[in-house]
């Protein structure tokens, strides 16, 4: 009964959220920060500095290399773009690095079928020391972003108090809506309040934000990925019910294509973020990404699972003594996704299990597909044991759907 209640509450919570009609599925795109940080040296490093050129080149790659057509449509500027404020108090971009302005970049992105995201901070300064959005500047900055035809705002939380954030984030949401332009709102609010109740009221956050950072910034290492995953798992009973169409928990960017993850770890992050219904925001150099990493990020079935219209966040349902964990996500049309994740550090492990042990209903027969290999299997009965072989720090991921009911039970499966 408790397990059924958890699923019911997740569905009810989605209904109670206030909507601006945006991000009915998790956003997909590219974000500058993890890979390019605050590199503003356009003399020594003109190809990689935070500049108009960088974003135009990434826009070209999104449009020409298949990313846009798979759903990766957001081109998101992060910190270090601001040049200051003009005499009327309006934000202006750095004139040397963004000589044509942000509206020019927005028009360029839109001409390629993309959307432009921008960054500010709910505080006196951004995290890297550029002019922030103080409470008296909220409406002005929202109007400026709308005039520039921006499509998403990421609002950070450095250099502000809890009181200022509690007032400022709802105020910005209202100001964005008042512009009449559809601007998705990415909040860092929960992360600056510890990510958990009672300091974080996720009902309120969900009414204000389309997505929100809950925890620490990701760094280019497997240790960082695991720390974020561990936090999400520890608190999944709080986090899972508040996610849904238009409102997403954000465990931060995808590292795939950078320097810190192995091949298996890259596949693991992609699979785990997908089953968590996380935003798929890449932060890598799309000009030099390897075909192997492109294959991970452009996996059509993976993207289909991430973008499932039900929008139910998955959760860990099994932690075995053999250091194998199983994550499950409910999908539309009675389908589901399973991720078998190995915490082992020795060798590939043969994991034996049955769907019955993973809370699938008795008496059903399933067909499925291995998300990474594409192999299709059929005739898997709930009660029959199967074996998956999982590499250390790797995953096996299945997409499953019932093809037959043997008449024993037709009840909906539960967590």
UniProtKB/Swiss-Prot annotation:
The organism's place on the tree of life at top rank: Eukaryota
What is the E.C. number? 3.2.1.49
The chemistry this enzyme catalyses reads: Cleavage of non-reducing alpha-(1->3)-N-acetylgalactosamine residues from human blood group A and AB mucin glycoproteins, Forssman hapten and blood group A lacto series glycolipids; a neolactoside IV(3)-alpha-GalNAc,IV(2)-alpha-Fuc-nLc4Cer(d18:1(4E)) + H2O = a neolactoside IV(2)-alpha-Fuc-nLc4Cer(d18:1(4E)) + N-acetyl-alpha-D-galactosamine; a neolactoside IV(3)-alpha-GalNAc,IV(2)-alpha-Fuc-nLc4Cer(d18:0) + H2O = a neolactoside IV(2)-alpha-Fuc-nLc4Cer(d18:0) + N-acetyl-alpha-D-galactosamine; a globoside IV3GalNAc-Gb4Cer + H2O = N-acetyl-alpha-D-galactosamine + a globoside Gb4Cer
Which residues are involved in binding substrate? 78-79, 154, 188, 213, 217
Query: Glycans attached where?
Result: 177, 201, 385
Entry's localization field: Lysosome
Show the GO cellular component annotation of the record: lysosome; membrane
Q: Looking at the keywords, is Nucleotide-binding present?
A: no
Q: Where is the signal peptide?
A: 1-17
Look up the record and give one Gene Ontology term from the biological process aspect. glycolipid catabolic process
Q: Does the record's keyword annotation contain Glycoprotein?
A: yes
Q: What class of enzyme is it?
A: hydrolase
Question: Where are the active-site residues found?
Answer: 156, 217
Q: Which GO terms describe its molecular function?
A: alpha-N-acetylgalactosaminidase activity; protein homodimerization activity
PTM Phosphoserine: list the residues.
322, 332
Q: Name any one Pfam family assigned in the record.
A: Melibiase_2
**UniProtKB keywords:** Disulfide bond, Glycoprotein, Glycosidase, Hydrolase, Lipid metabolism, Lysosome, Phosphoprotein, Signal
The intrachain disulfides are 38-80, 42-49, 127-158, 187-209
Its biological purpose is as follows: Removes terminal alpha-N-acetylgalactosamine residues from glycolipids and glycopeptides. Required for the breakdown of glycolipids.
PANTHER family cross-referenced by the UniProt entry: ALPHA-GALACTOSIDASE/ALPHA-N-ACETYLGALACTOSAMINIDASE (PTHR11452), ALPHA-N-ACETYLGALACTOSAMINIDASE (PTHR11452:SF25)
Q: Give the record's family classification.
A: Belongs to the glycosyl hydrolase 27 family.
Q: How does it assemble?
A: Homodimer.
Task: Provide the protein name.
Answer: Alpha-N-acetylgalactosaminidase
């Amino acid at each position: 009964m408790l397990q059924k209640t958890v699923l019911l509450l997740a569905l009810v919570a989605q209904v109670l959220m206030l909507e601006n009609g945006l991000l009915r599925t998790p956003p997909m795109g590219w974000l500058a920060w993890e890979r390019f940080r605050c590199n503003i040296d356009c003399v020594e490093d003109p190809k990689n500095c935070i500049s108009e050129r960088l974003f135009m080149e990434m826009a070209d790659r999104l449009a020409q290399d298949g990313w846009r057509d798979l759903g990766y449509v957001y081109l998101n500027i992060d910190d270090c773009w601001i040049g200051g404020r003009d005499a009327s108090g309006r934000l202006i971009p750095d004139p040397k690095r963004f000589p044509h302005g942000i509206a020019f970049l927005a028009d360029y992105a839109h001409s390629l079928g993309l959307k432009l995201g921008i960054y500010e901070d709910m505080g006196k300064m951004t995290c890297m020391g550029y002019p922030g959005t103080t409470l008296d500047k909220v409406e002005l900055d929202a109007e400026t972003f709308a005039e520039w035809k921006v499509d998403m705002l990421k609002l950070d939380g450095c250099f502000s108090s809890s009181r200022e954030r509690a007032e400022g984030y709802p105020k910005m949401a209202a100001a964005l809506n008042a512009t009449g332009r559809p601007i998705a709102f990415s909040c860092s609010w929960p992360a600056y309040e510890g990510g958990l109740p009672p300091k974080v009221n996720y009902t309120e956050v969900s009414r204000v934000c389309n997505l929100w950072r809950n925890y620490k910034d990701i760094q280019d290492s497997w240790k960082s990925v695991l720390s974020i995953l561990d936090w999400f798992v520890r608190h999944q009973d709080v986090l899972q019910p508040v996610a849904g169409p238009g409102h997403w928990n954000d465990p931060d960017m995808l590292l795939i294509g950078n320097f810190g993850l192995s091949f298996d770890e890259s596949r693991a992050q992609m699979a785990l973020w997908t089953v968590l219904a996380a935003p798929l925001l890449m932060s890598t150099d799309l000009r030099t990404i390897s075909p192997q990493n492109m294959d991970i990020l452009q996996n059509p079935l993976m993207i289909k699972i991430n973008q499932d219209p039900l929008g139910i966040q998955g959760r860990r349902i099994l932690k075995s003594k053999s250091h194998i964990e199983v994550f499950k996500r409910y999908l539309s049309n009675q389908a589901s996704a399973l991720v078998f994740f190995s915490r082992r550090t020795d060798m590939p492990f043969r994991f034996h299990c049955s769907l019955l042990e993973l809370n699938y209903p008795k008496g059903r027969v399933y067909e499925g597909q291995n998300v990474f290999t594409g192999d299709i299997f059929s005739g898997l009965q709930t009660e029959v044991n199967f074996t998956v072989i999982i590499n250390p720090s790797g995953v096996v991921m299945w997409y499953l759907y019932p093809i037959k009911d043997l008449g024993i039970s037709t009840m909906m499966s539960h967590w």
